[in-house]
Amino acid sequence: MKVINIILASIIIYLGVGSTCFSQENDKALLERVDKVYRLIPIDLNTDELLQKINEVEKYVGLVIDSIESKEAKEKARLIQAKGLLWSLGSYVFETGDKGLKDELSKRIKWVDLDSPSLELLDDIDVANLLNGYFRLFMPDLSELDRATYVLYNIKSEKIRNPYVLTALVSTLKQNGYTDAIQGVIEDIELCSKTESTIQKAHELKAQYYPVRVGEMAPDFEMEDEFGKMVKLSDFRGKMVFIDVWATWCGGCVEGLPYFMALRDQYKDQKDLVLLTISDDGIEAKSRWLKFLKEKKYSGKVPHLIINKEKDNFTKDYCITGIPRYILIDKEGKIVNAWHVAAKHELFSWAFNMELENMNRK
């Protein structure tokens, strides 16, 4: 109990909660108080301590909301309060599965209507946090795209649903590329959205990612290797090609590279498989790249290429928005998976072996 009182005192001092008189503050400042107090609640407490903390914070927030003058700002504060509960108490429920606390949270936010026009009072980030907090707790089986579909069909406000759905679309495309599920959401946007700019953006994303979906011809490229020789993807036609897109400055890439390089020995008898690395360091950082390859003893073991950002379209053609990226191409030069799981992933061997087997059947 002593610990929780110290934590609570810290929050009070930080927010200046010693007084319950907020008459000198404008509505904007009071809204910021409501938002901040929930973000300061730790969730590494036991159930009783957390509930006590939440009750204290809720009491404080109630006083703040009572001090807000405009009706619109009061409603916005209540929505921020709901968001705060979903990401404080809600996070604890999500981690522990505590049914009693979930029921308690449900009672506290039962007034929330996701289709309420009041949600337009929030900015896009707060709307997304409120919706995602709600979905995470009460519709946990929905994927990010499923959530977008739910919003399209159950929330009337274009101001609310357009940015939420487009954000989900972009996020999923960056993680998985163009899939049937993506196609379904774009069709839902065409059907549900009344905003031309939203439909146009969805079409632009389709045009960007569709060419690198499964089964399409992989865009050819030509890059310099570590020995100064120009190498094309098409040079390897008739062989399967597995590519690791990385950079020396990328911690996750450097961490994953040994696993990728180890595939050389694991698949040494697979003569129709080419392992290939492509560095995003850029030709201007060639010396650093070469030094890294030599120091790590990777030089000469597989073809190592480097992007010339001034003339290569590789990053654009393959929709490289983050690295590391792994790309698998079949013997005919068609994309098997342009968002392949990393070699260090626990499911890699199972997935990769199955893909190799399927490609060799053709």
Each language-model region and where it sits:
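Thiol-based oxidoreductase modules, predominantly thioredoxin-like and allied folds used
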Residues: 270-286, 298-311
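Thiol-/selenol-based redox modules, centered on thioredoxin-like
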Residues: 328-362
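Alpha/beta-hydrolase fold active-site loops
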Residues: 240-241, 273, 324
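A short beta-strand-turn-helix
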Residues: 222-241, 265
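Bacterial Sec-dependent N-terminal signal peptides
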Residues: 1-25, 359
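Conserved redox-active cysteine motifs that mediate thiol-disulfide chemistry
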Residues: 237-238, 245-265
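Short, internal strand/loop/helix patches
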Residues: 290-331
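Oxidative protein folding and maturation machinery
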Residues: 24-220, 224-227
